[in-house]
């Protein structure tokens, strides 16, 4: 990310298809072709890990296992694991512009069970599957067992399982469930094989076309996760694996009362004793599926916001010291220099800035934040961008540009129009993308919603809210030739065109 470049932020779930949720199928390959056509370098996505309650990719049952909602049925059909009749008439949802997660959860399971049954009955796949099991044994068995037992208890959270011996991982109890739930455990292993096979093939296609994938790693894991189940010593928990303290942030740009995330906090002293082995493994696994890695909430590594585990809001918390450079020094010693982006938004102080400097990771700039301050003093303003940074119009947590602009005061709108020298026939999305690509930041990322000039209804997430998020889906008809032409023109004009292809 040392040369001028650009890309588009678009999560897999937002891709168009007939299966209720975006997948690794034809539309994903067509999206890569669109990026190539418009001379982009990066496709940025949200975490690919499993989603849980609230459908957030930042609250996962596993820090490593993939989201099987993204498995493409047509690709399974090409492997002779499904027939089109198995899914052609299924109702995946009534609104093609939004994901119906509850419906997707139930109907996809039935179809995937057919594919798994056919897969296990076909000897031709078994050698490759055994290699997959062997190469992923550090996490795959635990994940499959966790999910099978969780399902057995009605998908209740780990802490609410009826069998406390299972929660505590009593060896005899676990052996009982391994025998009783053998078929279900195998289902979760095979669907992970499907996920990683399809994603690897898509990523290889993108890389061959000169497109790199920017992935995303949440700083925390969910309380209801395989990590909390198998490695409780790495978290601040009570004897029943309930979080003693939970994560969040105080009041910021996104919420006046702060954000209560609810994730268990790390027992950093224990991580240090173990040489940060869990983190090194997690980051190593991330770079097997991404080319560049954005680490969410980088501030939390210098100081993290600690809230009582029973609190209802995040504002009554306190800052506690994180591991600092000690963690990233250990990562560098084991894995070398890595292309990492630090999400350094929010309450960034001198200590966090020093950590960013010590790590030499590029930080982020958000033009929406910069333009909200009509004094021009915001460090997110275009004139304060620096080459060693990634600049965005907004992220998945921001409103899309149309919605954001319409929420501003007349003074703020006039400031933006004056600053960008907005043309009379130019949409606000075009003006913002033009300004974005003109900055000195080495990498500029536009959201797909802004590329498509979409309204506020296409917003991906409203922080500190539950329900109604992560649902937006693009329609193929949204991507018209004039939208492609504009993106390519801005990319070329501001010297960001991909030189690889």
Please name every model-derived segment:
Residues 2, 11, 17, 55-192, ...:
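Alpha-amylase-like alpha-glycosidases and glucanotransferases acting on alpha-linked glucans and related
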Residues 26-51, 289-290:
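Catalytic domains of carbohydrate-active enzymes, especially glycoside hydrolases
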Residues 36, 199-207, 332, 356-357:
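Surface-exposed amphipathic alpha-helices with a cationic face
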Residues 1-4, 9-37, 191:
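Asp/Glu-centered strand-loop micro-motifs enriched in Gly/Pro and often flanked by an aromatic residue
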Residues 37, 165-168, 173, 472, ...:
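Domain-scale activation on soluble regions of proteins
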Residues 188-221:
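Conserved, well-ordered alpha-helix/loop/beta-strand core segments that scaffold catalytic motifs
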Residues 46, 212-214, 218, 292, ...:
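Outer-envelope exported proteins of Gram-negative bacteria
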């Amino acid at each position: 990310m040392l040369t001028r470049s650009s890309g588009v932020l678009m999560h897999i779930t937002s891709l168009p298809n007939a299966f209720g949720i975006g997948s690794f199928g034809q539309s994903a390959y067509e999206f890569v072709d669109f990026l190539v056509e418009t001379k982009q370098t990066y496709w940025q996505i949200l975490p690919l890990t499993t989603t849980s309650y609230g459908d957030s990719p930042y609250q996962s049952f596993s820090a490593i296992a993939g989201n099987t909602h993204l498995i493409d049925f047509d690709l399974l059909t090409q492997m002779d694991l499904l027939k089109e009749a198995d899914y052609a008439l299924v109702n995946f949802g009534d609104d093609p512009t939004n994901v119906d997660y509850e419906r997707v959860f139930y109907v996809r399971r039935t179809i995937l069970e057919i594919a798994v049954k056919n897969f296990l009955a076909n000897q031709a796949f078994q050698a490759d599957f055994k290699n997959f099991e062997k190469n992923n044994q550090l996490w795959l068995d635990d994940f499959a067992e966790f999910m099978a037992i969780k399902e057995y208890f009605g998908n209740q959270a780990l802490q609410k399982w009826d069998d406390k011996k299972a929660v505590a991982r009593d060896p005899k109890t676990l052996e009982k469930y391994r025998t009783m739930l053998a078929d279900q455990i195998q289902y979760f292993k095979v669907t992970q094989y499907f996920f990683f096979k399809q994603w690897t093939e898509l990523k290889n296609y993108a890389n061959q076309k000169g497109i790199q994938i920017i992935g995303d790693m949440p700083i925390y894991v969910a309380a209801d996760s395989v990590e909390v189940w198998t490695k409780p010593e790495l978290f601040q928990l009570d004897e029943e694996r309930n979080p003693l303290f939970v994560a969040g942030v105080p009041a910021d740009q996104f919420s006046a009362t702060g954000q209560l995330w609810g994730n268990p906090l790390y027992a950093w002293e224990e991580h240090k004793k173990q040489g940060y082995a869990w983190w090194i493994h997690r980051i190593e696994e991330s770079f097997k599926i991404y080319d560049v890695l954005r680490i969410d909430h980088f501030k939390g590594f210098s100081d993290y916001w600690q809230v009582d585990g029973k609190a209802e809001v995040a504002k009554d918390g306190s800052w506690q010291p994180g591991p600092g450079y000690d963690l990233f020094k250990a990562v560098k010693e084991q894995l070398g220099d890595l292309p990492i982006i630090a999400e350094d938004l929010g309450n960034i102080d001198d200590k966090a800035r020093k950590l960013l400097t010590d790590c030499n990771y590029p930080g982020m700039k958000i033009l929406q934040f910069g333009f909200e301050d009509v004094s021009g003093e915001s460090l997110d303003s275009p004139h304060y961008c620096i080459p060693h940074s990634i600049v965005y119009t907004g992220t998945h947590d921001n409103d899309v540009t149309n919605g954001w602009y319409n929420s501003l005061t007349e003074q703020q709108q006039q400031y933006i129009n004056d600053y960008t020298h907005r043309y009379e026939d130019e949409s606000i999305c075009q003006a913002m993308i033009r300004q974005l690509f003109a900055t000195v930041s080495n990498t500029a990322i536009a959201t797909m919603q802004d590329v498509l000039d979409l309204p506020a209804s296409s917003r991906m997430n409203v922080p500190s809210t539950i329900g109604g998020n992560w649902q937006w889906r693009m329609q193929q008809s949204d991507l018209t030739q004039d939208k492609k032409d504009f993106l390519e023109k801005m990319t070329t004009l501001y010297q960001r065109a991909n030189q690889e292809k």
